[in-house]
Amino acid sequence: MAATPVPCDLADFARNRITFQSSWSHPMPITDGHELISPHAYAEHGPPHDLWTRLRVESPVHYCEPEGFEPFWAITKHADICEISTQPERFISEPGITVLTDSQRQALDTSAFAAMRVIIQMDPPEHRAVRKVASPVFTPLAIRALDEEMERSARELVDGLAGSSGEGECDFATDVATAHPLRVLSHMLGVPREQEPDILRLTNQLFALDDPELQRKGDDRQQAIMELGLELYEMFDKIIQDRRAHPREDLASILANGTVDGEPLGMMETVGYYLIVFSAGHDTTKNALAGGMQAFLEHPDELHRLQAHPELVDRAVEEVVRWTSPVNYMKRTAVEDAVIGGQRISDGDCLVMFYGSANRDADEFEEPFRFRIDREKNRHLGFGIGEHFCLGANMARRSQRALWLELSRRLEWAESAGDPEQIHSSFVVGLKHLPMRYRIRPATL
């Protein structure tokens, strides 16, 4: 007898995390949610695809109470995530988009981050008004104007891999995947090349609060997070003041001098805009590129397919984003009672939408666990959907496109040179190290 999803009128059983198996007298717990949200679980095991698969079948809207974290409903089906995401008036972002430990929440609430107002934590109508400040810069036409810069970055990085002999070893995650989007974003925001290491360090610290290698150092974690927030604020404040006094033709100036309803964008909103554009824009693309290369190493026939058919590059980009799902989840808070996936959700409940699970949903994707760059129907949620669809999606796509094309033309062969290492993070997921060996062809004019 197959497991039966918990219906509406048995929601109290769902809150006790029970699902019924072959015997009604032996309820078996699926999960308390720890494997879904613990940064260290992701570092050790990677994304929990086996557990997500089970949840999608047995308990697609699953109540979780992981020790040390706030309780939440785990949403694992593609259709349910779309339903929630397209009702921003019922499921809001303002209370927060991540699941935090009590200590993390206390540290963030007492740091400079508490004052920053980031666009992904705004709700309509404010969100739409603030989004319009930068949206003209991220249209497909505007981003295509950056193709030359993206192609230059890709060419220079692959040239660096080639060296004098064309053969070598590298850590693709740090040497290429990290560097490429950083250069593109620095160009857009007018950040000097010499300041890029500081941006990278702070971005790593922001998205890897629990990673022993990347996190801000210090025994007092609350103090470390406070210092991180202050340093980010001071760095962006300098850029904002400069662009207000000396505006240029760049995104930094547009944000620094942005207006909403005829009024200047507030300082905290402006700093928050910088924070999300630079940190999220860099980290997500970096993780897609690193995870994409890992996928190509594990599925060399797909790399050969791209090399033989470069016209598939746009589909390849979409498949890499589906496969890697760099933004693993987003949290929403219900502001009224609702029913999702047959479960009663109460006003005030937290819902965590796991995009990594939705992107392997067999009800949406044919052969979801197969990496294939010629996938035609690919309605993945790697960039989200609805009100908060990724503002920088066009940039992320074109940036990845440039690098995959350059590599497909010049990479003769590549293989793993060691074990990849996962970032200690459950929110933005990916590889911090990907050792590989390779042979690169010389560039052609």
Please give the residue ranges for each predicted region.
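Cytochrome P450
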Residues: A3, P7-L445
